[in-house]
């Protein structure tokens, strides 16, 4: 069975890992078969890299320091829900902050 391509903001359940993840990468990248995701937890304390999310079916915290890329075509997963645009915007801004270049002098 061919599964639809995951979309940015999708909350997925990974069967083998038995965990929820949030898809952070955009569709043009996800069509490669790979997707950048972060794990979701029910009981993590919110901070700069732990951002709370909610949808009709799930609420928890995205752990942005644990980004990873997954081959979703090779995994069994279920789409649980999607988060709102404003939430994905806050999350991608925080992730970008991890990689921003700030020159400094020694």
Give residue spans per PLM region.
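Conserved functional hotspots at enzyme active or ligand-binding sites that engage polyanionic ligands
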Residues: 1-106
